[in-house]
Amino acid sequence: MCVTSRADKMPSVKPKKKKIKKEINEVEEPEAGPEPAIEMEGLESRRQSESREPLTPEPHDNPPLKKKKKKKTHTFENEGEQQDHPNGDVQESPTDGEEVTKKSKKKRKNKMMENQSHNELGVEEDDIITDVHAPISQRSLFSAPLSHSHPIGKVFVEKNRRFQATDLSHDHLEEYMEVRPMWNTRDVAMRVHSGFRIIGLFSHGFLAGYAVWNIIVVYVLAGEQMTTLPNLLQQYHSLAYPAQSLLYLLLAISTVSAFDRVNLAKASMALRGFLTLDPAALASFLYFAALILSLSQQMTSDRIHLYPTANETLWPPGLEHQILQPWIVVNLVVALLVGLAWVFVATRPDMDYTEEFLMAMEVEEYPRHDDKHELAA
């Protein structure tokens, strides 16, 4: 009875082994399909990450298809082997099931590691650029826009550390006007000097003409060899004071203007100009000499102005020639000096050393009261 019971129990074990093997083969077959594809995708992603060339879609080559076909043939071979054993008589040790389960676990672990590496090194389809790169324009990237700017009727005012747009009205134009800087001492000196130089140029020319006219009138009234001096006194005594006053005024302005060109603020520079016969220095010297000579004959001009027929104390008879001859000669010399000085000035009217000195002068600007308050704030 014991033998028969054991014999009855043994055939019941064999179909269980077949089922276990069939289940294992079914587990292996679906897992064997995507494995090579995953491996190829991992290799392709690694190659794309290692090469720094622009990403372009790579066409699917035939090698993965061949591998799939090989895998399919392998599965067909496995099925053929299973068909060779219709009865399911497979000579395997009882530990084959445990080894298959261990292999499946290892394969799953390897698949998990490959999936993680594929996720880390893989390239998404959105990152692949299929379009051809457009050529970059040769213009600079920071070039100014070609469109013209148009004025707008708004002004941005900073309030509470923020810029706010406000409408620009005519009432607020005065507030946004540019404030002109205040004049300093140098600016005032430059303006005064330029204005006085224009007046001086006019006085130089007018003095030269007036001195020549004055000496011509005196010689005409005195006659040849000064024989008609009483006629000169009678005709010229009403013009003596105005003529001499105007001559003195023009000589004073011309002398100051000539010395103003020499820049007497630097004595060494002025002395060098006199020694080198500079035109501005020579003109100033000639005007100064003419002014001194004109002042030396001021008493004679007073006598001519006070000439009466009844006053014999100022003009005793017979002394007209002795009094008037030096006065006429001095006026002639003054006319010559003034004319020569005007020629020197006219040759170089733009030469002005004082203006150059003022331009090079540095002025210390002191802060205003408004600036002090701003600095304190």
From Swiss-Prot:
One of its GO terms (cellular component) is ciliary transition zone. It comes from Danio rerio. Disruption phenotype: Fishes lacking both tmem237a and tmem237b display defects in midsomitic embryos, including shortening of the anterior-posterior axis and small anterior structures, kinking of the notochord, and broadening and thinning of the somite. The keyword Membrane applies. InterPro entries: TMEM237. The lineage of its organism: Eukaryota, Metazoa, Chordata, Craniata, Vertebrata. This is Transmembrane protein 237A. The gene is tmem237a. It comes from the Eukaryota. Component of the transition zone in primary cilia. Required for ciliogenesis. It is a multi-pass membrane protein.
